[in-house]
Amino acid sequence: RMKEEPLPDTPLGRAGVDPVMIERFRKFTHLMEKYGLKLIVGIVTGWMSGRMHKPHAFQGLNVLSDPFAIRWEVRFVRAFVRELRNEPAIVAWDLGNECNCMAVKTSHEMWNWSNAISSAIRLEDSSRPIVSGMHGLKLEDEHNCSAMLADQAETTDVLCTHPYQRFTAHCLIDPVNTLRNAFHAAVETRLYEEVGGVPAFVEEAGSLGPAYSSETVAAHYLG
């Protein structure tokens, strides 16, 4: 259902997509184009700032492995990309913000999800690269592995790093504004490129706000 009404029998309705929201996003892309900005669009974004957001229909489901959830995610992704693929402000598609944090899964389930979403994007738009969008990729398969670096390099076109020392193994050693941490982003991104064999870039970086560092320390780190 969309609000309190059944899904309309339209291409967007059959994908569970509200046309009003599509037009709002389209207007947003036009504003970006007007002011000379470009967009990397994270499509499946349920995980934000340590909290999980998902539709009521997905409550109790593992959104990375449940076939019902993946079916509707693929429908949504195809409809979203199909509607917006002609917007020049969009330079790349991103699977979504740190989707490997959305649920517990095996590396096999994560590969299957990533491949399904990437394939859905490519069915509608093969002209733009697909960015992984994940956080903390693993080099080796571990118990409840978040996501394998090699698997993301296989299923997407571009890898990205979110180099927060607090959430990276063996990196919470020095103060945020010291020399070793200053090289964290560059070293991790270079590692992704060398191991994955695809381009990589720093997608997020920062000091995690006043809970971890003062404004003075944060300015020193980012400056």
What kind of region is each of these model predictions?
Residues 221-223:
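Active-site-adjacent alpha-helix of alpha/beta-hydrolase-fold enzymes
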Residues 1-163, 167-170, 176, 180-182, ...:
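Active-site mouth of glycoside hydrolases
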Residues 133, 201-204:
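Active-site neighborhood of phospho(di)ester-bond hydrolases with catalytic His/Asp-centered motifs
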Residues 198:
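Short glycine/Trp-rich loop-beta-loop segment that forms part of the substrate-binding cleft
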